[in-house]
Amino acid sequence: MSILNSDSPAALRHYRNLNTVKKGDSLISVKNNPVKYGYVEDKDIVRSMVVWEIIDLNEKINRPFYYNSDGLVASTKSLYQLLLDGVNDGSIKEVYKDEMFKDRMTKQEIENATKFVRVDDAYIERVNAGEKISEEEKQQYIDVYETKSENVKMLKIKGMWYIDRRDAQLKYRLLGIAAMGKDPASYALRGPNGEPLGNADELIDLFWVFYPSAREVLANAIVFNNKNLSSDLTFDDLLNARRFSSIIYRSENGYGTGNIKDYIPNDANAQLEESERIKNQILEMENDMWNY
C-alpha cells in the first residue's frame, strides 16, 4: 500500500502487514505468488555443477540484503530478519543445520543458534539460598545476547548450474541459503578487565534454509532501493536474477566436492583465482555444449 493513499500511519502499516490495499470500502489482496520453476527431469540435464558461494554484505552491490527499515514510504527488512521471522512464525519450515539438508533444526535449536542468555553467578546463589527475587532485580542479573541484522555480515548460498537438453541453455537454480554471524555465546566471553574475548572475525552458519520453501515469504518482501523507495522488486526476484556479487568457495561437478581453502590452503590470492576459474568453467559448459 502506498503512503500516498493512506489515511494514517497506523492504517498504512496495518494493511502492509496483511498484504492488502484498501480501495473504497473493499480490501484487495496484493499477495504475490512466486513465479513457478519449470519442471526438469534428470534425463534432461546434460551437464551440471553445484556451487557454494559467499555473499559479502559489506559490498555496496549487496547492501539491499542488509538494509532493515520501518519507514513510512518503504518498510523493508534484511534478508536475515525475513528468514528468522519466517522460521519463528512457521511460514518457513525447511530449516537445517547445514547445506546437506539432512538434519532439521527445531525452533529451540534455532533460538540457541541466534540467542544466548547469560545468568550472573550471584543470581544463582541467591536462588539456591531460597531468596525471593523480583522481576526488576532479575533483569540486573541476566544478559541476553542476540544475533541481529547488523551482526550478520555474510550470506551463503548453494545452487546448481545446469544445461537443459530441451533448449540447450545454461540455467541456475538456487537450492539453499544461510545467514552467517558470530556465535551469540561469544559475545558473553569477557576477560578479567571486561574486555571481549570472542573472535570478532569468526562467523558460523546460524541455520540453512532450503530455498524453495522460503520463496513465498521472499516473493512478498520488498528489497530496499535507495533510488526508488516505491520499488516493488522482491528478494525472490533479486536472488533468482543473481543481482549480487559473490565468491565461490566450494564446488561439486560429479568428480567430488571440495572446499577451495582445503586444497589451496593459506593463499588468499590463489583461492580467489580458483574461484574465478570455476566461474569460467561454468560459462564454458554452454560453449562446450555447442561444440560437442
Task: Tell what function each PLM region has.
Residues 136-170, 182-223:
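Short helix-loop boundary/capping segments
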Residues 231-292:
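A cross-kingdom marker for long, charged
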Residues 194-258:
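A recognition module on extended beta-rich or small alphabeta surfaces enriched in W/G with H and D/E
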Residues 1-144:
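N-terminal Sec/ER secretory leader and immediately downstream segment
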Residues 56, 96-97, 106, 148, ...:
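Short, solvent-exposed coil/turn linker segments
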